UniProtKB/Swiss-Prot annotation:
It holds the Pfam family UDPGT. An anthocyanidin binds at H20, H150, G373. Its EC number is 2.4.1.91. It comes from Actinidia chinensis var. chinensis. Catalyzes the glucosylation of quercetin. Preferentially uses UDP-glucose as sugar donor, but is also able to use UDP-gal and UDP-xyl. Is probably not required for the accumulation of anthocyanin in red-fleshed kiwifruit varieties. It is an enzyme of class 2 (transferase). GO terms for biological process: anthocyanin-containing compound biosynthetic process. CDD domains: GT1_Gtf-like. GO terms for molecular function: cyanidin 3-O-galactosyltransferase activity; flavonol 3-O-glucosyltransferase activity. This is Flavonol 3-O-glucosyltransferase F3GT2.
């Protein structure tokens, strides 16, 4: 056997939808920097790899190589605007598309795969790893709170039942460590409500059942954010390794700021500007966009709004002209840099996990408008567990709900307390990625897991 064939080779299986592939690639790049002799084959769909692998990053790491796998869409089939259709096709192609991709990676590299690093969604990777005789290391790209909900799905279903009524929707999960603030109604779809038999819900259920088989479960968070949940997960899983927040644990990068957001922010006082963004996938319904715009115009607070161009016709007539003196609307903003800017006073967000972490590391309290997935659960933790933000009255944007939330953050004692709380969390996050911090130690454990992978045939 050649020395090349004995080289460590990690197959990385990415979920190609939403904001899953990018955090996984960021983790892989950290690992590749610390393990320059280890080969990482990053497997995802062609469309996902095109977006996730900009040319600069591809050229930066000699030991990270993307491989395209079949997306499951039949030849000649046109995907509609519904994103769930593409997800459904992809799920039907699993795991055969990844098996084919791994075979190609082994053939091209001449190195047998020694480890599977996967999105935690892929419960079947436990079976693949067992067949191959290699470790399975799943990466949960969200927080410990949502992971706990999936690990404890059967307990939740037995305790609360699967039928929501007006009497039980506000029942809390006080029987699960760290989730006492969470209401039954906050749970992601597929845990207790929604179509429990859908392929996606079944995938998440099987994930929760199979994670105890994993060599280690890696989380995109830090232990000090959810200590009780982390302690409980450590009793249920073999290794629980929080390695974030990624914006603090990785080398700082400067994104292009073609819209001049940072220069515009430089002109404003500390903690005076509202930053508004709902990520790259979500756009609030037109009536809510209109209400949000009316609230911003009426309140006259300085604001920076990242909003795709196709949504701008929703604005009230004359809106952009009316707010020119105190507002700025852009099609894209360098979010991590914006949230780190001292002039930002509040983040109006959908509560995606990456956005929450960036808000914490920026020390910016939040106004929450969740839409789907783990976002409602995350927003509950933001408001009632960590006390670093507020949810909108009624759960949606109206002119009055937005103005009330803004007034609370900027003008009331409660808002001052929220800011103090998130500054304390920011320090804990900074400490976690320090030289002797918990996330640094966990990352070193992950490095050892990979370094000690043995050739499956040795």
């Amino acid at each position: 056997m050649s020395d090349h064939s004995k080289a460590l080779h990690v197959a990385v299986l990415a979920f190609p939808f939403g904001s899953h592939a990018a955090p996984l690639l960021a983790l892989v790049c950290r690992l590749a920097t610390s393990n320059p002799t280890v080969r990482f084959s990053f497997l995802s769909t062609a469309q996902s790899n095109t977006h996730t692998f900009p040319s600069t990053r591809t050229n930066e790491f000699d030991n990270v190589r993307p491989y395209n796998v079949w997306d499951g869409v039949p030849e000649g089939h046109q995907i509609s605007g519904n994103p769930h259709v593409g997800t459904g096709f992809f799920l039907k192609a699993l795991p055969h598309n990844f098996k084919a991709g791994m075979a190609k990676a082994e053939e091209e590299s001449g190195a047998t795969i020694n480890c599977l690093l996967t999105d935690a969604f892929f419960w079947f990777a436990g079976d693949l790893a067992e067949e191959m005789g290699v470790p399975w290391v799943p990466y949960w790209t969200a927080g410990a709170c949502s992971l706990s909900a999936h690990v404890n799905t059967d307990v939740i279903r037995i305790t609360l039942g699967s039928t929501r009524t007006t009497q039980n929707t506000n029942q809390t999960l006080n029987f699960i460590p760290g989730l006492s603030a969470v209401h039954m109604n906050d749970l992601p779809g597929g845990v207790l409500h929604g179509d429990l038999e859908s392929p996606f819900a079944q995938m998440l259920h099987k994930m929760g059942l199979n994670l105890p088989r994993a060599t280690a479960v890696v989380l995109n968070s830090f232990e000090e954010l959810e200590p009780a949940i982390t302690t409980d997960l450590k009793l249920r899983l073999q290794k629980v390794l929080h390695v974030g927040p990624p914006s603090l644990s990785s080398s700082p990068t400067s994104s292009l700021d073609e819209s001049g957001c940072l220069l515009w922010l430089d002109k404003h006082e500390a903690a005076s500007v509202a930053y508004i963004s709902f990520g790259t996938i979500i756009t609030p319904p037109p009536n809510e966009l209109l209400a949000l715009a009316e609230a911003l115009r009426a309140s006259k607070i300085p604001f920076l709004w990242s909003l795709r161009d196709h949504s701008r016709p929703i604005f009230p007539e004359g809106f952009l002209e009316n707010v020119l003196a105190f507002g700025k609307v852009v099609s894209w903003a360098p979010q991590s840099q914006v949230l780190a800017h001292p002039s930002i006073g509040v983040f109006v967000t959908h509560c995606g996990w990456n956005s929450i972490l960036e808000s914490i590391t920026g020390g910016v309290p939040m106004i929450c408008r969740p839409f789907f997935g783990d976002q409602t659960l995350n927003s509950r933790m933001v408001q009632d567990a960590w006390r670093i933000g507020v949810r909108l009255d009624g759960g949606v944007f109206t002119k009055s709900s937005m103005m009330s939330a803004v007034e609370l953050i900027f003008s009331r004692e409660e808002g001052k307390k929220l800011r103090e709380n998130i500054i304390l969390l920011k320090q804990k996050a900074t400490d976690a990625v320090g030289a002797s911090g918990s996330s640094t130690e966990n990352f070193n454990v992950l490095l050892e897991v990979i370094k000690t992978c043995k050739h499956p045939k040795s």
